[in-house]
């Protein structure tokens, strides 16, 4: 997992290496790309001496990836940096590098803001949000996962301007409002590193950096600078048309109908009326079309609305509830999709912008 931090194009050659630090029967392994630094701590069964050294990531990974799980003995000569790794049936010999030039990270000060989040909550919220982040070089502020801590709740938000995810957790709050914007790379790293039985995660942050401590390691990262847009202002609050439908059934219908939509627009049409939910698509250029009906619970006047099919499928795929509620105001305003049953102490909301229908 540490190897995923290391960039293929590092500005400093030493960052192609892992930093090994041995002290007090503990070995700390560090990987960095200058913006993100991950440290993992390993308890040693036996240790003689202390010190630090660097090993190129390709050397150590190629050496160890073919070995089955077993104890290893690592012997390093301080003067020459000669390394010998002894395993059950053999050994490796190679040369390490001095750790003198490896960049060091500074711990956050006590003045930094902090949040304590259960690992399972953080994993679920980041996993639900990452698909909605942007890849926009002109608006880098939209490329991250935004954490907004208020006296009422912690909101974890992501948006690319076409779709939006807002996760509210009411058990995590702060009298002093604070926020930070976590870049996509460290967010992905956290999603893959953390385990759901990993206890609580402590996040300390200031205007520029964050330090995230979990059960057996720490991630330091640079934050995205800038003011995040007012995400609440784009969420319609008056949505008289509401459809409750089986999430998996709707996903399956979209998979069948979407191939018949225009390849360029991927427009699918949803029509709701008197307990009838119709999903359809059409490609006028190739004279193809598809239509499928689902059962639903619907309140409101008959309505047709268009969405980009692939985006709607992404939204539905990142929810886990059996049923979802689609809330609409009119065909020109954003649609809101929420789980029919919200997770405990949470309010999960996804928003998707509509597309113009050719009536």
Which sequence ranges carry the predicted segments?
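Structural preference for solvent-exposed beta-strand-turn elements
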Residues: 1-359
């Amino acid at each position: 997992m540490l190897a995923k931090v290391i960039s293929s194009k590092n500005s400093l050659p030493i960052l192609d290496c892992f930093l090994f630090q041995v002290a007090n029967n503990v070995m700390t392994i560090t990987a960095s790309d200058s913006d993100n630094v991950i440290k993992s701590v390993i308890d040693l069964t036996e240790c003689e001496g202390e010190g630090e050294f660097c090993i190129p990531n390709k050397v150590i990974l190629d050496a160890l990836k073919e070995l089955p799980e077993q104890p290893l003995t690592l012997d390093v000569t301080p003067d020459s940096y000669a390394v010998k790794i002894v395993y059950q049936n053999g050994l490796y010999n190679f040369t390490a590098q001095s750790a003198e030039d490896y960049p060091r990270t500074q711990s956050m000060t006590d003045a930094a803001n902090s949040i304590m989040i259960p690992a399972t909550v953080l994993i679920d919220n980041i996993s639900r949000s990452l698909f909605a982040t942007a890849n926009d070089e002109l608006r880098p502020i939209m490329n991250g996962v935004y954490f907004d801590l208020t006296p009422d709740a912690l909101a974890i938000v992501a948006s690319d301007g076409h779709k939006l995810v807002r996760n509210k957790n009411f058990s995590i709050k702060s009298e002093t409002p604070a926020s930070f914007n976590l870049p996509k790379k460290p967010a992905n790293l956290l999603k893959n590193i953390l385990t759901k039985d990993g206890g609580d995660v402590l996040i300390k942050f200031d205007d520029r950096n964050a330090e995230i401590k979990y059960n057996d390691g720490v991630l330091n990262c640079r934050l995205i600078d800038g003011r995040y847009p007012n995400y609440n202002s784009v969420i319609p609050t008056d949505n008289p048309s509401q459809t409750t439908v089986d999430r998996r059934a709707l996903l399956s219908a979209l998979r069948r109908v979407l191939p018949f939509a225009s390849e360029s627009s991927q427009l699918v049409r949803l029509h709701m009326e008197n307990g009838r939910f119709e999903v359809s698509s059409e490609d006028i250029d190739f004279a193809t079309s598809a239509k499928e009906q689902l059962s639903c619970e619907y309140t409101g006047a008959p309505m047709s609305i268009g969405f980009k099919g692939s985006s709607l499928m992404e939204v539905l795929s990142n929810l886990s509830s059996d049923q979802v509620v689609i809330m609409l105001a009119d065909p020109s305003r954003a649609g809101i999709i929420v789980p029919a049953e919200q997770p405990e102490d949470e309010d999960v909301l996804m928003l998707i912008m509509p597309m113009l229908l050719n009536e």
